[in-house]
A protein has these predicted regions:
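Generic helix N-cap/helix-start motif at coil->alpha-helix transitions
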Residues: 6-11, 26-28
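Hydrophobic/aromatic side-chain positions at a characteristic register within alpha-helices
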Residues: 19-20, 39
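TPR-repeat structural position
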Residues: 24-25, 44
């Protein structure tokens, strides 16, 4: 795998662990941070699927203001939210939390052909399924306009 997606997949692992511990608020925080990381790697579909997962958990969440998270990046509200969460869950803190889970990122990453495929798997879907879900959501949004 070529791209450095360690922080993205770390946040996704922590989101998964939070879901298993029945901590939906914490899961949403990690999904939001993962989405921001995905955007920085031009993985807009991963970011937008994280957005859908956040809205599924909390339909009134701030991310609902935007149709895509690429649009959200233009907003100072998005910047403030991400900045606040990054202070709380810095790279170092996230890596410490991941160590507690006993996950070896290098070993896991070796089984995927791309960082995007790895990220999709941590969201519980294949990349193709994520793209299909997003296509349907976008079509549905267009038909209601």
């Amino acid at each position: 795998m070529q791209e450095d997606v360690d922080l993205l997949v770390t946040y996704l692992h922590l989101a998964w662990a939070s879901a298993r511990r029945n901590r939906p608020l914490v899961r949403c925080r990690f999904l939001l941070l993962a989405a921001d990381e995905a955007l920085s790697h031009q993985m807009n579909d991963i970011a937008d699927f994280c957005r859908l997962e956040i809205l599924r958990e909390n339909p009134a969440h701030l991310v609902g203001r935007w149709d895509t998270l690429a649009q959200a990046q233009e907003s100072s509200d998005w910047d403030a939210l991400v900045h606040q969460l990054r202070r709380r869950y810095s790279r170092e803190r996230a890596e410490q939390l991941l160590d507690v889970l006993g996950i070896d990122l290098a070993l896991e990453q070796a089984t995927y052909s791309s960082g995007e495929e790895y990220a999709a798997s941590l969201l519980g879907k294949s990349l193709e399924v994520i793209k299909e879900i997003l296509r349907r959501v976008r079509e549905s949004d267009e038909s209601t306009e």
